[in-house]
């Protein structure tokens, strides 16, 4: 397990490679990541680094959080996230209040991005589960977009849990793995990732080094 960063989704754009091909990218703002707490296996039972990003007014946080930030000597942040790391990865340069910048990710490396997906509201089975529509005519009068049978009759006489049906779509925690880092802007604290990531503009996301890519190596 390695250290990650807290980011904010700025939006999507495209950049051109040297060969002239267009690459769609998502821009994430990962600036001002500050260390709030350093956990060790001896004291806390496991090793981790707790980070915060953004800024929040003091009257908008609880007294417990206010004291937590004060002990670290950092300004109150909007988001707090804990990243589990190996004990030997905690070096002497990592101290409370120090900033972690985007340089921990290299161009061409792979990352996993977690966030809350865009909520779509109440959706049918075609949009939610990729079901197919029935015939538009030729014997079909009122069953064009219905899901079909959802269970048996008297035995068992119920709908099994997990049955794909209509319901709320989106608005859940989602992770996309093995996203390529196309560009890193150390001056503005931006990272450009190939393709899309969960959430809408302004949403908070968490970026970690790719788990699957690390296992392959």
UniProtKB/Swiss-Prot annotation:
| Residue numbers spanned by region Disordered | 131-155
Q: Which residues form a coiled coil?
A: none
A GO CC annotation recorded here is: cytosolic large ribosomal subunit
Which spans does this entry mark as compositional bias, Low complexity? 132-145
Pfam families associated with the record: Ribosomal_L3 (PF00297)
Write the signal peptide boundaries: none
What does the PTM comment state? Methylated by PrmB.
One GO biological process this protein is involved in is: translation
Name the Gene3D superfamilies on file. 3.30.160.810, Translation factors (2.40.30.10)
Does the record carry Cell membrane as a key word? no
Keyword terms, alphabetized: Methylation, Ribonucleoprotein, Ribosomal protein, RNA-binding, rRNA-binding
Gene Ontology MF annotations: rRNA binding; structural constituent of ribosome
Q: Which residues carry this modification: N5-methylglutamine?
A: 154
- Tell me which domain of life the UniProt entry assigns to the organism this sequence originates from: Bacteria
Q: What does this protein do?
A: One of the primary rRNA binding proteins, it binds directly near the 3'-end of the 23S rRNA, where it nucleates assembly of the 50S subunit.
UniProt subunit comment:
Part of the 50S ribosomal subunit. Forms a cluster with proteins L14 and L19.
User: Which NCBIfam families does this chain map to?
Assistant: L3_bact
The similarity comment for this entry is:
Belongs to the universal ribosomal protein uL3 family.
Question: PANTHER family of this UniProt entry?
Answer: 50S RIBOSOMAL PROTEIN L3, LARGE RIBOSOMAL SUBUNIT PROTEIN UL3C
Identification of the protein by name: Large ribosomal subunit protein uL3
**Organism encoding this protein:** Nitrosomonas eutropha (strain DSM 101675 / C91 / Nm57)
